[in-house]
Amino acid sequence: MSDIESLNGGDLFAEPSDFYKPPPEPHFATYTRDDVPESSTSQQKDIKLRLVGSSPLWGHLLWNAGIYTAKHMDSHPEEVQDKLVLELGAAGALPTIIAGLLGARKVVSTDYPDADLISNIQYNVDHNIYGGEELFKDEEKRSKQMANRKVVVEGYIWGNDYEPILKHLPQDQQKFDLIILSDLVFNHTEHAKLFKTTKDLLRENGKALVVFSPHRPWLLENDLAFFKDCEEFGLKSDLIELTHWKPMFDEDEETVEIRSSIYAYYLSHI
């Protein structure tokens, strides 16, 4: 008998039929705007988002914080309309799309420069803002196309050089009126980079909208430290609201009160 045959006559080193599983396919989620403000540039109510099949960066889910952020923006269109808006860690990019539909002057939607994640954000922008029109493959045509768009997508690592972001703004206005940080607070090791990016890119009288849910109840203290530690970077926090929704996951009943929480804050310059 061959050394590489199993006792039942098969190949000892053959991979089982289910050894390699292809990554999950992208899936779709639809968000319906409750009350579209009359001043909204677009009265579109249904937003169909494509979400990546899986992501170590958690971009494959439509989080409660993102939905809350979208509702907040529709309820306060004056914070968005004709404003320069930046979203950090956009994932499915629901707040980005709401900002575009409301009539922001410019929206720069960013997330970690993972090819699948960024192309998925671009897909959602293309199909919800631009009627399915995709970006040109030709670099020169693509550049002109992006220059004419009010909503653009960029890969960006927090705290790095700002050129990929600022190139989309007018030369005489290199700051944002509104910066969106939706469900990013859980990245405790990245707080300093988020503070620096926010401080550097937020205009003097601008606001950062920070919304999060405590996905790890035992680390809530670390989450909330974000809103005190920001002072070391010249930023102050103001609580907008603490509310409760059905938590994203069915887990320990003892922690449901914490996991159902949604915190919303403004950050601004001290």
Swiss-Prot record:
Per UniProt, the keywords (alphabetical) are: Cytoplasm, Methyltransferase, S-adenosyl-L-methionine, Transferase
- Please tell me where S-adenosyl-L-methionine binds in this chain: W63, G89, A90, A91, D111, W158, S182
Domain of life of the source: Eukaryota
Which Gene3D superfamilies does this chain map to?
Answer: Vaccinia Virus protein VP39
Q: Which CDD domains match?
A: AdoMet_MTases
One GO biological process term is: methylation
Q: Which top EC class applies here?
A: transferase
One GO location term (cellular component): cytoplasm
UniProt xrefs under PROSITE patterns: SAM_MT_NNT1
Location in the cell: Cytoplasm
Give the InterPro entries listed for this entry.
EFM7, Methyltransf_16, SAM-dependent_MTases_sf
Record-linked Pfam families: Methyltransf_16
Which stretches does the entry tag as region Disordered? Answer: 1-45
Q: What is its EC number?
A: 2.1.1.-
What's the main place this protein lives?
cytoplasm
| Gene Ontology molecular function: any one | N-terminal protein N-methyltransferase activity
Coiled-coil intervals: none
Family, according to the entry, reads as follows:
Belongs to the class I-like SAM-binding methyltransferase superfamily. EFM7 family.
Summarizing the function annotation, the protein's role is: S-adenosyl-L-methionine-dependent protein methyltransferase that trimethylates the N-terminal glycine 'Gly-2' of elongation factor 1-alpha, before also catalyzing the mono- and dimethylation of 'Lys-3'.
Q: Which PANTHER family match?
A: HEPATOCELLULAR CARCINOMA-ASSOCIATED ANTIGEN (PTHR14614), PROTEIN N-TERMINAL AND LYSINE N-METHYLTRANSFERASE EFM7 (PTHR14614:SF10)
- Please give the name of this protein: Protein N-terminal and lysine N-methyltransferase EFM7
Q: Native species of this protein?
A: Kluyveromyces lactis (strain ATCC 8585 / CBS 2359 / DSM 70799 / NBRC 1267 / NRRL Y-1140 / WM37) (Yeast)
Higher taxonomy: Eukaryota, Fungi, Dikarya, Ascomycota, Saccharomycotina
| Gene name as annotated | EFM7
